[in-house]
């Protein structure tokens, strides 16, 4: 029996993680959850799974859930804020922490979980992007597994199993291309949030949907892959694959290319991470090769989708530059969703902040938190948020 904590239990990945646990109750037990303010969903989770702990970040939501548990004589202990997140990430009985919160908020709980010897099922891209070197070194120090919970890195992880790192030539990360695949810059001037939120293949949260539309999501995955698999940026390639059947590939020096293929369904990488190193009975629709008419691959347009190009630049620059990129992107996406900037301005703001805030400093926890704060305060004042 594996005991699980889910950080971000009410979001897209968190909800699908609950689906996996629901179908594997003999092997997986939900011990603790966190959420921002979706108290109704938290109450439903408490009713069904009866976790020992629930954490709410927002004060009012915390009080509502706490009152519900008291009134209904439910034993779930309700905690709040970052202290609560860290507490449930370091519980002695927990084996694996699923980090599916969005943004920088997942960084400190993830590091604390690693220091407590927990395996990490990592769905929070930002953690590795801003502090990859620190996270990976901590994981090695404490002998814990960092298990990627996304289709691309989960695929690469599987393609590498049983092979030697020195035999790898290239990692090939596939991208659906998002809702604007094939469009040029001039065609994206009038894009509104509702257009960018319509992903052709995946059901995702709002922030990651916008990242997918700008190809920033793929840029973050390139930086993640660098840290997760120890591969240089020049050997990490992005290929647009609109069918989303091939989830990523590894090219070896003898010319062999190993690809992981499956129906596009996030429950597969979630299930694989939670049960690692074992495989369990499938919870997704099997891949039917007779129904696949063709598989196509294209080169990404980095001029139109500037954030992908900037992610490579930030990764190669290293230090705190990925943290600057990430902080600027989180704010820029929020500004776009609120109608305060245009779609193409997202890339412009990333470039502006990378130029303005770069400092030659090591990516320590203190440094990345500090530069992230600087970027957010600057954009906050600029756009009065």
Curated annotation (Swiss-Prot):
Signal peptide: none
Catalytic activity: 2-C-methyl-D-erythritol 4-phosphate + NADP(+) = 1-deoxy-D-xylulose 5-phosphate + NADPH + H(+)
Residues reported in the UniProt entry to bind 1-deoxy-D-xylulose 5-phosphate: 125, 151-152, 176, 199, 212, 217-218, 221
InterPro entries: DXP_reductoisomerase, DXP_reductoisomerase_C, DXP_reductoisomerase_N, DXPR_C, DXPR_C_sf, NAD(P)-bd_dom_sf
Cofactors named for this entry: Mg(2+); Mn(2+)
Listed EC numbers: 1.1.1.267
Residues the entry annotates as binding Mn(2+): 150, 152, 221
Molecular function as annotated in GO: 1-deoxy-D-xylulose-5-phosphate reductoisomerase activity; manganese ion binding; NADPH binding
Functional pathway: Isoprenoid biosynthesis; isopentenyl diphosphate biosynthesis via DXP pathway; isopentenyl diphosphate from 1-deoxy-D-xylulose 5-phosphate: step 1/6
Taxonomic superkingdom: Bacteria
Residues noted as binding NADPH in the record, renumbered to the chain: 10-13, 37, 124, 126, 205
Keywords carried by this UniProt record: Isoprene biosynthesis, Manganese, Metal-binding, NADP, Oxidoreductase
GO BP field: isopentenyl diphosphate biosynthetic process, methylerythritol 4-phosphate pathway involved in terpenoid biosynthetic process
S-S bonds: none
Its biological purpose: Catalyzes the NADPH-dependent rearrangement and reduction of 1-deoxy-D-xylulose-5-phosphate (DXP) to 2-C-methyl-D-erythritol 4-phosphate (MEP).
UniProt cross-references to PANTHER family, sorted A to Z: 1-DEOXY-D-XYLULOSE 5-PHOSPHATE REDUCTOISOMERASE, 1-DEOXY-D-XYLULOSE 5-PHOSPHATE REDUCTOISOMERASE, CHLOROPLASTIC
UniProt record similarity statement: Belongs to the DXR family.
Protein name stated in the entry: 1-deoxy-D-xylulose 5-phosphate reductoisomerase
Gene designation: dxr
